[in-house]
Amino acid sequence: MTMTDTASETKPFQAEVAELLNLMVHSVYSETDIFLRELISNASDALDKLRYESIAKPELMEKGGEPKIRIIPKKAPDTLTIVDNGIGMDRQELIDNLGTIAKSGTKSFISKLAETKDSAGLIGQFGVGFYAAFMVADKITVTSRRAGSDDVWTWTSAGGAGFEIAPASEEAAARVERGTEIVLHLKPDASKYLEDWQIERIVTEYSDNIQFPILLMPEEGEPRQINSASALWQRSKSELSEDDYKQAYKQIAGAFDDPAMTLHYRAEGRQSYAVLLFAPSTKPFDLFEPERKGKIKLYVRRVFITSEAELLPPYLRFLRGVIDSEDLPLNLSREMLQKNPQLAQIRTAVTGKVISELESLADKKPEDFTKIWDAFGPVLKEGLYEDFERREKLLSLARFTTTAGEKRSLKQYVEAMKENQTEIYYLVGDSLERLKSNPKLESATARGIEVLLLTDPVDAFWTSGQLDFGGKPLKSLSQGDVNFDLIPKLEQDQDKDNKDEAKVDEATVIAVIKDALGERVSDVKASQRLTSSASCLVAGGMGPDRELEKLLARANKGAGSKPILEINLQHPLVAALGDTKTDKAEAADLAFLLLEQAQILDGELPEDPAAFASRLNRLVLRGVVAHG
């Protein structure tokens, strides 16, 4: 050891930790039971790590006894001690693990915790469970010995601005042969956690399926095990109740909601493995982090290996659970995980099983499936873009809001298609309200044609894949030409059509607009989409849809392909362009107005807002609209 290593030292908390501790210390939350669940979960993780590291280094298990977790209540003074004989921590690990939070999303957690009283769910989601102990303790002492080390360190904090790290006393070092001892000096109003029955109640509710024995060491009476310590996923489905699965989900996922779907089965044959997966009923906070990492835990013969094995494709990353293999080697390295053919086979098989389970749920319990889709549909739709092999199945699972005002499957959409309708129409945008008022819907609405309204960011990407469903291609209403000639308008719209019909020289009007706008648009066309609006912007028939064009243009800071301006020849503004009384300056103003109002309706600002305002003022003052 160096001089610094042997000396007692006081260190400040990382800023986020200090803020988090302030919330915990002054907490008014009612779900304080969770502190014990979180500490037991951490102890279980430490035992898992020891078991894994001891595969390569058996000597790590020589001191400290069989893996277990002990809970020791003690009155006068009121302390609750949680002890594990797991991997333990050295000095730097104590500083890193208890003095800082490296996990992304911490600031988001703190802001959410300050806003809500659902501390239980948030603490479980964000993985900052150790600090929950400050809800019940005004001081915490952690003594730890790293497996295989002679050095023992003590970390102490009263939840203020910092903590003290020092070599452990001889007495404390003698108590901790291996692993970690956490002593909570309880607040006066937390003394109930010294009652044996309270401890048993919490362990039974939250931690019964922890794989290691949890021993209660009462002040009076003999120590006793208070959890079942069984790997629930290895048990038969017939032995388990719905409550068993709910408890297992909460323990495995660190969650407080109930699972929306449970998949439990055992595969036998060329490979043997057990699978227990859950779909949450609420969105995890990190669902859309750029890494798109899954949270499935890989075990080999009940030995925890990793939760970073990419056991499912990214579009199923919302699932939580366990896969326990009988055949994989225990010494899997990170590199081997990426290349192991057995693991790849497990991934393929389990992914297929998950899709089948979702199909079954959609068929037999549509309301339950809709809840999953509402929470995780944007993630599942990533598979439409990435998983060509399962695209058809994922399309069948997809549920879409439509102009009919309800969530529908593509099968339901196709069954309701109009006579002579050969395509499935959709429109992509960033807001349902804006889409519903989009002028590109007008001609379809006039014919009673249903249109899918897509508002998730991923929609602009997966729809670019030239997809079809049941032989019916998906067609964007903001790309290429549309032809509704074989589908008659509804009666009221036919009457309106006859009244609004106007005679305009198409070629003349288009030439005037092109001359005014120049290269600001790629083309000007008469529209088959519009019935009441004057203009709209669309993309060409080849390449990206209009919404994807806009996304790509923003990503390239303005560089992108030019849109096509479509005009409604029956609209008075357009008719005014063909009027011989309209001079060239007025015609240019009108042409720009057609472009700029189309941009606004498309969710964009005009290129020059000041010029747009001046132009609009001029037209209003001149009363040009009256020319129509």
UniProtKB/Swiss-Prot annotation:
Report residue spans for region: A.
Answer: 1-334
Q: What is its main location?
A: cytoplasm
Q: Where in the cell is it found?
A: Cytoplasm
Name the domain of life this protein comes from: Bacteria
Q: Which InterPro entries match?
A: HATPase_C_sf, HSP90_C, Hsp90_fam, Hsp90_N, Ribosomal_Su5_D2-typ_SF
Region C, annotated ranges: 551-628
Per its UniProt record, what Pfam families does this chain match?
A: HATPase_c_3 (PF13589), HSP90 (PF00183)
> Which UniProt keyword terms apply here?
ATP-binding, Chaperone, Cytoplasm, Nucleotide-binding, Stress response
Where do the record's region annotations for B lie? 335-550
Q: Which Gene3D superfamilies match?
A: 3.30.230.80, 3.40.50.11260, Heat shock protein 90, C-terminal domain, Histidine kinase-like ATPase, C-terminal domain
Q: Which GO terms describe its molecular function?
A: ATP binding; ATP hydrolysis activity; ATP-dependent protein folding chaperone; unfolded protein binding
Q: Which GO terms describe its cellular component?
A: cytoplasm
Record HAMAP family: HSP90 (MF_00505)
The record's family statement is: Belongs to the heat shock protein 90 family.
Quaternary structure? Homodimer.
Q: What role is this protein assigned? A: Molecular chaperone. Has ATPase activity.
Q: Which NCBIfam families match?
A: PRK05218.1 (NF003555)
**Name of the protein:** Chaperone protein HtpG
Q: Which organism is it from?
A: Rhodopseudomonas palustris (strain ATCC BAA-98 / CGA009)
Upper classification of the organism? Bacteria, Pseudomonadati, Pseudomonadota, Alphaproteobacteria, Hyphomicrobiales
Q: Which gene encodes it?
A: htpG
